[in-house]
UniProtKB/Swiss-Prot annotation:
<dbReference type="Pfam" id="PF00623">
    <property type="entry name" value="RNA_pol_Rpb1_2"/>
</dbReference>
<dbReference type="InterPro" id="IPR044893">
    <property type="entry name" value="RNA_pol_Rpb1_clamp_domain"/>
</dbReference>
<feature type="binding site">
    <location>
        <position position="74"/>
    </location>
    <ligand>
        <name>Zn(2+)</name>
    </ligand>
</feature>
<comment type="subunit">
    <text>In cyanobacteria the RNAP catalytic core is composed of 2 alpha, 1 beta, 1 beta', 1 gamma and 1 omega subunit. When a sigma factor is associated with the core the holoenzyme is formed, which can initiate transcription.</text>
</comment>
<keyword id="KW-0808">Transferase</keyword>
<dbReference type="GO" id="GO:0006351">
    <property type="term" value="P:DNA-templated transcription"/>
</dbReference>
<dbReference type="InterPro" id="IPR034678">
    <property type="entry name" value="RNApol_RpoC1"/>
</dbReference>
<keyword id="KW-0862">Zinc</keyword>
<feature type="binding site">
    <location>
        <position position="76"/>
    </location>
    <ligand>
        <name>Zn(2+)</name>
    </ligand>
</feature>
<dbReference type="InterPro" id="IPR000722">
    <property type="entry name" value="RNA_pol_asu"/>
</dbReference>
<dbReference type="GO" id="GO:0003677">
    <property type="term" value="F:DNA binding"/>
</dbReference>
<comment type="similarity">
    <text>Belongs to the RNA polymerase beta' chain family. RpoC1 subfamily.</text>
</comment>
<feature type="binding site">
    <location>
        <position position="475"/>
    </location>
    <ligand>
        <name>Mg(2+)</name>
    </ligand>
</feature>
<feature type="binding site">
    <location>
        <position position="92"/>
    </location>
    <ligand>
        <name>Zn(2+)</name>
    </ligand>
</feature>
<keyword id="KW-0548">Nucleotidyltransferase</keyword>
<keyword id="KW-0804">Transcription</keyword>
<dbReference type="InterPro" id="IPR042102">
    <property type="entry name" value="RNA_pol_Rpb1_3_sf"/>
</dbReference>
């Protein structure tokens, strides 16, 4: 591909998520413009100018950092149109390019003081606490400026490495150190805040700690051993990924592209903005104030308070509400942080990446389809014509019914008989997939042969309900059409409902009749205790075949539980305990009749069976006839 405009495909095997180093974060946001100017750092909390409605320079929507807000137009308007592609305006410094770059170009905020990443500090488990082998409460005391931590005990005999000291305790020790009679030469070093945490993490030699832990694990057991293994696992993962523990303390914060946190003007001149902009603004304001305080050498207590506020602002940006008070906006609504956008059912992954809308799919309520075979489903005509429209259009043109796509679509809208006939031809042998959420195992999505039905509900065979965990009280199912021949073949061979009789989890049948099917089968074959058994030859209760019984039942000449004599020449298994027939007689033509409790057989002179009549109920005839039909058509 020589043309640079053509997109090249990047083939990759996997996506790896690791900790980002400060240099990597700056790489994401920092760019060198064609004129050599380096841009990327967001230094101002402003978003847009409310007079000109244009983004403020070096602000959260800066066109120099993120790209122009209008295609092929710089900020000041000197350069317009595509012919100036790639030029950097000498007046405003904006590169002339497409506005869609604002969807992927990032910026960054350089922090005046390090801050701890709230995920690794307050997550479960707390990786910072595990790595430092300190209680989470102690680590929090350090980060949020409540306690000092000893970074180097020096010559002081009462201090230990990583020991916590309150403000008063440290003041007492300072008095000792700087007293005239003090013998301490090597002064102890203490720290507070995320800077101290970063120092502690930098001091960790992962390989040495891992080696020591392995030795300790061999000589320990119980709770202590479990704790050591937990710490070793975290350290081994850091070593394997090449990440450094001090990267869990942030020096640089990435600013996501402006089109992913938009600001839109409403009717009446007011603006609606993403919550992220407010959270970023808090961080920038506090960061700038801290930088100014450090510049003018403000008292330590004021600087420390500003550092704590910066830490809380970054916490709220990354995960609002994880620690401390939740930051709220107008009408006391908690602001949506980066974590809130990513996590949960409505988050970016589950809602937008995994839960994308797909073409050639539909959704409707399911109802029972008792006349369907197990591998079939009833698909409403209205849905089928929409789902299979490309196939129908192709066939209509191929059969010279219409000349072009437009004419075919008009014909389809009228839903003529001709179109329905073509649709029937298209769906014959074209499986569709039915899915019921939640798809908890592979049988939650299965393939079926569609049968066109009237109405707007999908018809489903009752036997496949346990696999989908479906019932008919208003459940909905999604329909998907496999397009490629390979997909259709796979659906037919592997996913057809009649090929998925056993549960993949237990190996036991998942296609089992239940509830109304069992009750119906019982009711159909039940014997009525007070029903009288007719004599053989009674014209109203003797039939020449199973079909005659069913016709008589359909005409309401006999009831479901009435006893009937029906001719049936097949094998009969009965529980007749009599060794001898109730009655046996030989007729004048040499044929012999044997009367049993539930059957009457007639044999010729040589003992061959001529005819057999069975005494049974109409319901049992219906059941038997249904099974014979099902087996014959399988």
């Amino acid at each position: 591909m020589t043309n640079s405009n053509l997109r090249t495909e990047n083939h990759f095997d996997y996506v790896k998520i690791t900790l980002a180093s400060p240099e990597r974060v700056m790489e994401w946001g920092q760019r060198t413009l064609p004129n050599g100017q380096v841009v990327g750092e967001v230094t101002k909390p402003e978003t847009i100018n409310y007079r000109t409605l244009k983004p403020e320079m070096d602000g959260l929507f800066c066109e120099k950092i993120f790209g122009p807000s209008k295609d092929w137009e710089c900020h000041c308007g000197k350069y317009k149109r595509v012919r100036h592609r790639g030029i950097v305006c000498e007046r405003c410094g904006v590169e002339v390019t497409e506005s869609r770059v604002r969807r992927h170009r990032m910026g960054f905020i350089k922090l005046a003081a390090p801050v701890s990443h709230v995920w690794y500090l307050k997550g479960i488990p707390s990786y910072v606490a595990i790595l430092l082998d300190m209680p989470l409460r102690d680590v929090e005391q350090i980060v949020y400026f409540n306690c000092y931590v000893v970074l180097d005990p020096g010559d002081h005999k009462d201090l230990k490495y990583k020991q916590l000291l309150t403000e008063d305790e440290w003041l007492e020790i300072e008095d000792e150190i700087y007293a005239e009679e003090s013998e301490i030469e090597n002064e102890p070093v203490v720290g507070i805040g995320a800077e101290a945490l970063k120092q502690l993490l930098e001091d960790l030699s992962l390989e040495e700690v891992a080696q020591q832990l392995r030795e300790d694990i061999n000589g320990s057991k119980g709770q202590k051993r479990a704790k050591l293994i937990k710490r070793l696992r975290v350290i081994d993962n850091f070593i394997a990924t090449g990440a450094r523990p001090d990267w869990m303390v942030l020096d640089v914060i990435p600013v996501i592209p402006p089109d992913l946190r938009p600001m839109v003007q409403l009717d009446g001149g007011r603006f609606a903005t993403s919550d992220l902009n407010d959270l970023y603004r808090r961080v920038i304001n506090r960061n700038n104030r801290l930088a100014r305080l450090q510049e003018i050498l403000a008292p330590e207590i004021i600087v420390r308070n500003e550092k704590r506020m910066l830490q809380e602002a970054v916490d709220a940006l990354i995960d609002n509400g994880r620690r401390g008070r939740t930051v709220v906006g107008a009408n006391n609504r908690p602001l949506k942080s980066l974590s809130d956008i990513i996590e949960g059912k409505q988050g970016r992954f589950r809602q937008n990446l995994l839960g994308k809308r797909v073409d050639y799919s539909g959704r409707s309520v399911i109802v029972v389809g008792p006349k369907l075979k197990m591998h079939q489903c009833g698909l409403p005509k209205e849905m089928a014509i929409e789902l299979f429209q490309p196939f129908v259009i192709h066939r209509l043109i191929r059969q010279n019914i219409v000349n072009n796509i437009k004419a075919a679509k008009k014909l389809i809208q009228r839903a003529d008989d001709e179109v329905m006939q073509v649709l029937q031809e298209v769906i014959d042998g074209h499986p569709i997939m039915l899915n019921r959420a939640p798809t908890l195992h592979r049988l939650g999505i299965q393939a079926f042969e569609p049968k066109l039905v009237d109405g707007r509900a999908i018809q489903l065979h009752p036997l496949v309900c346990p696999a989908f965990n479906a019932d008919f009280d208003g459940d909905q199912m999604a329909v998907h059409v496999p397009l490629a021949i390979e997909a259709q073949t796979e659906a037919r061979m592997l996913m057809l409902a009649s090929n998925n009789i056993l549960s993949p989890a237990t190996g036991e049948p998942i296609i089992t009749p239940s509830q109304d099917m069992v009750l119906g089968s019982y009711y159909l074959t039940a014997l009525q205790p007070d029903a009288t058994q007719p004599e053989f030859g009674d014209r109203s209760a003797t039939f020449a075949g199973l079909d005659d019984v069913i016709h008589a039942f359909d005409d309401t000449r006999i009831g479901l539980h009435d006893w009937v004599w029906v001719r049936f020449n097949g094998e009969v298994e009965d529980d007749d305990e009599l060794q001898e027939p109730l009655k046996s007689e030989t007729l004048s033509d040499g044929t012999r009749i044997e009367q049993w409790t539930y059957r009457r057989d007639r044999f010729d002179e040589e003992g061959a069976l001529i005819s057999r009549y069975v005494l049974t109920t109409v319901g049992r005839v219906v059941m038997n006839h249904t099974i014979i039909d099902a087996v014959a058509s399988a």
